[in-house]
Amino acid sequence: PIGMIEVEPVDAESEVMEIVEPKPEPEGYNPTYGSTYDRVMDRGYVICGTKANFPGFSEKKLVEFEDRWVGFDADICRAIAIAVFGDESAIEYEVVDGRTRFEFLIDGTIDVLSAATTYTFSRNVEKKLEFLPTTYYDGQGFIVRRTLGVSSAKQLHGAKICFSGSGTAKNNIKDFFKLHNLDYVPVEVPVGKSVKDFYIDGKCDMYGTDASGLASNRYGFKHPERHVIL
């Protein structure tokens, strides 16, 4: 630790600057890296959790005749491997989804998570996870079929909305509809099923998540032009 300068006013016309010496560290103080670091170093590579088939962020593609993880989140995983080992290949990708991402991180299946995860106070405190600096700023979005004929989410009164029990979208949707005095019909997607697939199968009028996630999802639709992001 370094010393700091403390200013103590004496009267209205003068100030005395006192140099405060740093206090000695407590006896037995020995800062160390956490268990995750030790595990990674012993293993020799980083296990990074990321989503599959998430265009622009993380997906496996054929690059120069070999399968390679590409996208923003996948590149962050690769950057961590370079920072730790100086080798971008010192990485193993583990596929996660909205329900398994925290479970895998907590039980040690993965060392780090890079998978479009909203930073919230409750997640930071309750799950006892260390969030790294934010890498992407986004907001809540909604996706609907173009045939619905709406141009604003405020026109979705009475809509059937698919959501999963995990993630922040459920509460975001609830808050949005309450704020604008709109009713909706919730359609909860069972564990193991995809909200996106429920929507494609016509089981709801819309679903919501981060706007970037919706753009990525729509890119993979058979007819992306038939869907609108609000």
Predicted regions and their residues:
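Short helix-initiation/N-cap motifs at beta->coil->alpha
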Residues: 33, 90-103, 148, 184-201
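Alpha-helix capping/helix-boundary segments
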Residues: 119, 149, 168-169, 194, ...
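Ligand-binding cleft/hinge of the Venus flytrap
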Residues: 61-66, 78-89, 131, 169-190, ...
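Acidic, polar ligand-binding/catalytic clefts
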Residues: 55, 78, 82, 86-155, ...
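Second-shell loop/turn segments in exported
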Residues: 59-70, 90-91, 101-102, 158-163, ...
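N-terminal hydrophobic or amphipathic helices and topogenic motifs
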Residues: 1-92
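Solvent-exposed, acidic/flexible segments
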Residues: 30-33, 66-77, 94-98, 135-136, ...
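Short, Asp-centered acidic motifs that coordinate Mg2+ and/or phosphate
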Residues: 46-47, 111-112, 204-206, 213
